[in-house]
Design a protein with these regions (language model features):
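Small-residue-biased structural context
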Residues: 1-152
Length: 152
């Protein structure tokens, strides 16, 4: 269910060690993604247009950076990853136009979908890219220590 009102901090997406992938440039841009998504979840309606505009700028940079890495290093599964980036960016831009017309509900719906989408995208697609990039720069796989998570 999509909230019609801002969420409080305990309900919104928040950065934590569970999102670390071990390749610092990706981890840093992911933290910004999570922080902006959480801000949009907690924002009053009047603040959403400016936050979504800031998020759109972030998203363009974020995806362009990852796409460039995938292309320049010939990352094998780059096509599906880049297609997903393009689809998400297109959705955000479409919602930005609808929000400008006053449709706050669709913006809140988008933000909730982004909060649900990101963890899986990061775990599946971006973790593979992080391993790939780390192996290209360091010659191995990253070691990630996550505080407060149980071991399997």
């Amino acid at each position: 269910m999509t909230p019609t009102e801002p969420l409080d901090a305990s309900e919104s997406l928040q950065w934590g060690d569970q999102f670390l992938l071990g390749y610092t440039p990706i981890d840093e841009v992911h933290q910004e993604f999570v922080d902006l998504t959480g801000q949009m979840q907690r924002a009053a309606d009047a603040a959403l247009p400016a936050l979504l505009a800031e998020f759109t700028v972030h998203l363009k940079h974020h995806f362009e950076m990852e796409n460039e890495w995938m292309l320049s290093t010939e990352f094998p599964p780059r096509e599906c990853h880049m297609d997903e980036h393009a689809a998400v960016l297109q959705s955000v831009q479409e919602v930005q136009a609808l929000l400008a017309q006053g449709n706050v509900a669709i913006c809140r719906d988008l933000v909730e979908h982004l909060a649900q989408w990101f963890p899986q995208h990061a775990d599946q697609l971006d973790s593979a890219l992080a391993h790939w990039m780390f192996s290209r720069t360091m010659g191995g796989k990253p070691v990630v220590l996550r505080r407060g998570l149980s071991l399997r």
